[in-house]
Amino acid sequence: MRNVTFRQLRTVEAVCRLGKINLAAEALGLTGPALTLQIQHLERDAGIALFDRTRGGMVPTAYGLAFLEAARAIEDSLIALEDSIDAIKGLRTGRLRLGVVSTGKYFAPQLIAAFRDQVPAVEINLFIGNRAEIIAKLRDHEIDIALMGRPPRDFEVRAQVFGDHPLVFIAPAGHPLAGVLEISRERIAQEQFLVREKGSGTRISLEIFLSDTPHELEELGTEIASNETIKQAVIAGLGIAFISAHTIEQEVKLGRLVILDVIDTPIRRQWFTVSRLDRVATPAMQAFERFVLASGARYLPVVSKPYPANAFG
C-alpha cells in the first residue's frame, strides 16, 4: 500500500463523495473510462474491492471507507502544512472551516467578527447545522472546529469549555404559568410542547430532563426544526418550548416571551470548541481556539434570574 499515490486517494474520495463515476470524473477533470481504470488498477494492486457497484451508484465498502479516511487526513495535513509555511514566513493567514450548531448562530457572528478584528487575514468558512449534522461534518473532516454542546463520543475529539449554556422553558406573555414559582416537572409535562427535531442537542437535554415523567415527547407536542419558528409559535400561543436562553434574549427583553420558573432550571450545559483529536491543528485553528477560550464567554447572554421579562442582565 505504500505505492498508493495521493492522486489515487483523491479519486477514491471523489467517487465516495459523489457516488457516480461520471460526476467524479467531471470533478477531477478526467474521462469516465480513465477514472474507472484508476479504480480498477488500485483494486487489483491492493487485492480488495473499494466499491460495490449498484443501480444507485458506487457504494464504498469498508476498504473504500478506509481509503476515504486516509485521503481526508492527508488533505487536512496538506492544509496544515500550507498554513504552517505561511506562519513561518510571518504571514498571519490561513483558512478555517467552522461548524456551529444552530443554537450558536445567535452569538457566533459577533464572536467571529471580533476574531477577524484581531486576525483579519484568516478566511473563515461557516456552516450552521443541528448537532447531528455538525458531528457528521467533523467526523468526515469537512470542518476543522465545531462550536457546540455535548461533544460526540463515537470518535476521539479535543473538547474545551468556553462558556455556560443555560436551557430554559419559555411561554408567551400572559400564559397561566408565567410568574408561577417552582413549577414541577410533572406539571410542566402536562403542557403542549413545541420541540426540536431528533438529533438536536436541545431535544436530547429535554428528553433527559423529562425522563422521570410518564410522557414521551411525541405525545407532548409538535416537532419543529427551527428555533426561530419555535419562538414565533410560542409567541402565537401554540404551546411552550424548551430552548437555549441564548436564542431568546431580545424577545424576553421586549416582553413577548417569559422564562418559566421550573424546578431545577435553567439547566446548565456548557459550550465547547471541538476538533478531531487526530487532526493536525493549523495556526488558524490554534489562533481561533485561543481567542474563543479567552474571550468567547463574553459574547454569550447571561441569564441573571429564571423569570420573567428582566431575566437578562
UniProtKB/Swiss-Prot annotation:
SUPFAM superfamilies: Periplasmic binding protein-like II, Winged helix' DNA-binding domain. It holds the Pfam family LysR_substrate. CDD domains: PBP2_CbbR_RubisCO_like. Residues 1-61 form the HTH lysR-type domain. InterPro entries: LysR_subst-bd, Tscrpt_reg_HTH_LysR, WH-like_DNA-bd_sf, WH_DNA-bd_sf. The keyword DNA-binding applies. Keywords: Activator, DNA-binding, Plasmid, Transcription, Transcription regulation. The keyword S-adenosyl-L-methionine does not apply. Transcriptional activator for the cbb operon for RuBisCO and other Calvin cycle genes. This is HTH-type transcriptional regulator CbbR. It comes from Rhizobium meliloti (strain 1021).
